[in-house]
Amino acid sequence: MNNLQTKFPHIAIKLNEPLSKYTYTKTGGAADVFVMPKTIEEAQEVVAYCHQNKIPLTILGNGSNLIIKDGGIRGVILHLDLLQTIERNNTQIVAMSGAKLIDTAKFALNESLSGLEFACGIPGSIGGALHMNAGAYGGEISDVLEAATVLTQTGELKKLKRSELKAAYRFSTIAEKNYIVLDATFSLALEEKNLIQAKMDELTAAREAKQPLEYPSCGSVFKRPPGHFAGKLIQDSGLQGHIIGGAQVSLKHAGFIVNIGGATATDYMNLIAYVQQTVREKFDVELETEVKIIGEDK
């Protein structure tokens, strides 16, 4: 597997790369092989090679709603951060997988295109956002998603239309079929720039008031359970401020777990499990994680 550097001398590849550099929690072990393609063609080459040689392949986006275990990840990590182009086509925007959702929302603002205001504070990448149908403040990616270019796990290129991109709360066809997002097309609407800016300012202020942006975190840890709010259940369980190792249930928003210093992925996972157990015992409600947990234990 380490011969990938010889096989693909034109592609940026690192060995035993610490993944804590790439996650918002600042935790996680190392990747055996860390690949950073600069083009869709390079990504396609690596995916096809991994499939042909039965090498485990994991896709890494912006690392924002993710916990990578302390033992790291075996096989190949494909990091699509270098695929960042964003372009306008009439009232549509085409953004590549590695483009930040926040940057895409700002691009739309500058082009006087409305529809992505809800995304102005979501820290993920386009690829990650499509994978989990990211959303906030009443908006979701699926509301404006028109089409996507993806790779299958065999390296086959596919163009998916809106009708093929089924989505629900924190779910997508892309996740279900384990597709690798290369780009996304969003259908937006012309609007006065000052009105778009006002909406984004309003949402940014709400986010800054409610979320613990001053600490590393993995964002919203739990999905919203039917008929409840995860943060309220956690707060009512007396868990706000609870600490395990360097991980703490945020004092600002109980739905977040923050790294207050030196946290490990194991600290995060132990605290998540403790919160789930406590809420289950107190309210008979099962909290399902929204954050994705991958990798191996140390």
Swiss-Prot record:
GO terms for cellular component: cytosol. Its cofactor is FAD. Keywords: Cell cycle, Cell division, Cell shape, Cell wall biogenesis/degradation, Cytoplasm, FAD, Flavoprotein, NADP, Oxidoreductase, Peptidoglycan synthesis. Residues 26-191 form the FAD-binding PCMH-type domain. Gene3D superfamilies: 3.30.465.10, UDP-N-acetylenolpyruvoylglucosamine reductase, C-terminal domain, Uridine Diphospho-n-acetylenolpyruvylglucosamine Reductase, domain 2. The keyword Oxidoreductase applies. The active site is at R170, S220, E290. Disulfide bonds: none annotated. Its main location: cytoplasm. Its EC number is 1.3.1.98. It comes from the Bacteria. It catalyses: UDP-N-acetyl-alpha-D-muramate + NADP(+) = UDP-N-acetyl-3-O-(1-carboxyvinyl)-alpha-D-glucosamine + NADPH + H(+). Pathway: Cell wall biogenesis; peptidoglycan biosynthesis. The keyword Oxidoreductase applies. One of its GO terms (biological process) is regulation of cell shape. It is found in: Cytoplasm. One of its GO terms (molecular function) is flavin adenine dinucleotide binding. Belongs to the MurB family. Cell wall formation. PANTHER family: UDP-N-ACETYLENOLPYRUVOYLGLUCOSAMINE REDUCTASE. This is UDP-N-acetylenolpyruvoylglucosamine reductase. It comes from Listeria monocytogenes serovar 1/2a (strain ATCC BAA-679 / EGD-e). The gene is murB.
